[in-house]
Every structure is written in C-alpha cells, then in structure tokens.
Amino acid sequence: MENINYQILKRSEKKLLKLFFEYFKHVINAHETLNQLLCEDNLEKRKELIKTIYEMEDQSNRSEFKLINESIWTISKNSPLASHLRLTITIIMSSRDLERICDYANNLTKFIEHYLHLDIKIFNNLVTLHQSALNNLKKTFESLQDKEKPLTLQFENATKTIIEFEHQYRLVLTKYYETINKNEVTERIFLIDLVASVKHIERINDYCYNIIKSFLFIKNPEIFN
C-alpha cells in the first residue's frame, strides 16, 4: 500500500512540475515579447505587441490559478509525505513569484504604451536592463531543469546578479537624469515613470532569487538555518 501511495505521489509531482515549467515558459515568452516591443520602431507593430502582452498577462492569471488548484487538490487527495508536501508548497509559492514577474511585463508595457508617441530610441538603455533580467530568468528556468549542476551555483549567480544590477541601473538612471531638461515638467514626470519601470525590472531578479531559494529548500531544509 505504501509503494502504491508513493507511486501516486510521484505521478502527482510529475504533473505539477510539468504545469509549473509550462507556466515558466509562458512567463519567459511574455518577457521576450516585451523585449521585442522595446526594440520595435514600427508603430503598428508596437501596438500589436502591446495587445499580445496584455493577452499573455490574462493567460498568466489563468495558468497560475490552474497550477494552484492542482497543487491544493494534490495535497487534499494524496496525504503527501513531508518531502512531497515541501515540493507542492514550493510550486505554489513559486507560481506566485512567476505571476508577479509576468505582472512586471504588463506594467512595463503600460509604461511604453503611455509614451508611445516618443521615439523608441529613448528606451535603448531600458532594453539593456531588461535583457539582463530576461537572461537571469532563462538561467533560473534552465537551472531548475538541469539535474547535473547543483542549484547552489545558480543561487550564487542570482545573488551576484541582484548586486550587479543595482550598480547597472544606477548608471542608466544617472545618464537619463543628465540629459533631461529639469525645468520641463513632462520630462521630470517621464523620469519618475522610468524609475518605477526600472524597479519593476529589478524585482524580476528578486523573484528569480526567491524561486531558486525555494527549490533549494526542498533538497536541504536546513540550508538557510
């Protein structure tokens, strides 16, 4: 009976992980689409990309609800062991992190849409920052699927990325600040909106860190004591 229950739990785990990684891919795709938007100079194509990202945000919400419901159902029907329960809870927590990461794609898109009348070149430095966060997101995805490399390596990388990104975005914002007309209200407002958008990008790295940390905890619950 114990072996049967273990097999059921492993099947449930496999199903949950499949849903989780499908959702993760969707979030990456949303940010890849955002990256295209930041680089696209054709106005009509930009409008199409904006519409696509908003639709992807709606799909993100549905995917998150589906994953959480499946996780709750797994807990209620299978009476999971401690290790299985830790994985299920981690998937729930990480799905919330992924939903927030997708939210940031949505929020950044709103920022770009609001300034659609401006030359796309004004977002050049934002492209660099976002590409950095997108690369970190992809590395996080790959590290969770790579059973050969220890997760501690990506945890160290995620920690390093957060520190490096702070230095990077300060340089970018300083450059923007030096180029604006301080007496022009619209330019000051743009800078404020830009700072908020940069912080959205920064949070992507924070949530990548959270996801790696959560999955590390499954393998070694004592690691952060």
From Swiss-Prot:
What domain of life?
Bacteria
- Native species of this protein? Mycoplasma genitalium (strain ATCC 33530 / DSM 19775 / NCTC 10195 / G37) (Mycoplasmoides genitalium)
Q: What NCBIfam families does UniProt report for this protein, alphabetically? A: phoU_full
Output the GO biological process annotations, alphabetical, semicolon-separated: intracellular phosphate ion homeostasis; negative regulation of phosphate metabolic process
The protein here is known as Uncharacterized protein MG409
InterPro entries on file: P_transport_PhoU, PhoU-like_sf, PhoU_dom
